[in-house]
Amino acid sequence: MTKQYKNYVNGEWKLSENEIKIYEPASGAELGSVPAMSTEEVDYVYASAKKAQPAWRSLSYIERAAYLHKVADILMRDKEKIGAVLSKEVAKGYKSAVSEVVRTAEIINYAAEEGLRMEGEVLEGGSFEAASKKKIAVVRREPVGLVLAISPFNYPVNLAGSKIAPALIAGNVIAFKPPTQGSISGLLLAEAFAEAGLPAGVFNTITGRGSEIGDYIVEHQAVNFINFTGSTGIGERIGKMAGMRPIMLELGGKDSAIVLEDADLELTAKNIIAGAFGYSGQRCTAVKRVLVMESVADELVEKIREKVLALTIGNPEDDADITPLIDTKSADYVEGLINDANDKGAAALTEIKREGNLICPILFDKVTTDMRLAWEEPFGPVLPIIRVTSVEEAIEISNKSEYGLQASIFTNDFPRAFGIAEQLEVGTVHINNKTQRGTDNFPFLGAKKSGAGIQGVKYSIEAMTTVKSVVFDIK
């Protein structure tokens, strides 16, 4: 019999009347079960968090930081245990899964330290007008209250920690909703917060079926801030339900790699492979299309093809480069994009092959803009090459996307690269490197349908706080 995992609510581990069974994407074996919470149980989570918030916010930054450092230490101690489960639950290579836990600990430690650098300021009215020269404003940051943190399946631990730690150090309380496929990993993360001894109600978890509690947890007026990573469709729905409440949304992307004539093609190919096929392409920041100058396209395509053929294919426990996708629905969607490109004349340079949820890495050359693969986000191991004849054409295609997360430019002409970067409608541009999240002290954001708000530890703390100004007159 597999393990029944529990939610952590108000300092206690709790089961629910109903449960959700979690299966491994690679083998189909049952990994365990998590509680399927009811709306009444959600009410209790939120009430517990609200009750705990005044005492938590009254602690100093240094006191809250001490709790977070304990959490990070526990995660480092248990990284192999958590990584082993994470690897099975989301079909991620074991080494990558352990690295995710380590990175989460690093983010939590950094957030604890960054909180100590959050300072207020004093403003003088005389800077605006002489009549107000005796007015002084003391400006401080205060927590928003209860933060609902919702993490995605592809990084259920890391993209939870990047939300939770900045919120907690700022004096907020947390209701953490892990993804259904990733819930067990999320509850293992919760064990670290529980063991660290945070006061009851400060950190809580919610697991359950989206059809039953998905809208309820977002619409609930106890929630003061919603921090979500996931699909654009769900993100847009959350935005509408949030109303006047602040939100942070990290959504989809169609990141372009623009390759100019003077690029180091070996470096370019290496980065494109890592960017496109890491975790089987199931990353919002994955390289999802290559826009290459026709004059160097043949040479680059051959280099990429050689590296695609060298990728290992198999199961997560083997640390294969390409592992099964998260579920059948996702694999079906990727297969649909592949078939559309193939039917419309794109040149498949590797074998088109699928076994269950496992899709072998596919490289398409001569993809055109009438193909779905040129525009839609596959979230799978398929990479389209689009040949262009000018920088202007590459910029135009890149900017026509409904998404605006990131882009890469490969060139040895850095002034030219900066000029192109200014024209790209994305949150981040990488020069001579793959698109990727991080480092986590950098701002991370998306334009258009790729998100709302700015992440990165300092920016996340600022987002999940509000400014209060206290004004008085000097006599």
UniProtKB/Swiss-Prot annotation:
Annotated InterPro entries: Ald_DH/histidinol_DH (IPR016161), Ald_DH_C (IPR016163), Ald_DH_CS_CYS (IPR016160), Ald_DH_N (IPR016162), Aldehyde_DH_dom (IPR015590), ALDH-related_metabolic_enz (IPR051020)
Binding positions for NADP(+) per the UniProt entry: 151, 177, 180, 215, 230-251, 377
Keyword Ribonucleoprotein: no
Active site: E250, C284
Domain of life where this protein originates: Bacteria
EC class: oxidoreductase
Coiled-coil zones: none
Catalyzed reactions: D-glyceraldehyde 3-phosphate + NADP(+) + H2O = (2R)-3-phosphoglycerate + NADPH + 2 H(+)
GO molecular function, one term: glyceraldehyde-3-phosphate dehydrogenase (NADP+) (phosphorylating) activity
Keyword NADP: yes
Annotated EC: 1.2.1.9
Alphabetical UniProt keywords: NADP, Oxidoreductase
Chain residues that bind substrate: R103, N154, Y155, R283, C284, T285, R437
Subunit comment: Homotetramer.
Family of this protein: Belongs to the aldehyde dehydrogenase family.
Entry protein name: NADP-dependent glyceraldehyde-3-phosphate dehydrogenase
Organism field: Streptococcus mutans serotype c (strain ATCC 700610 / UA159)
Gene name for this UniProt entry: gapN
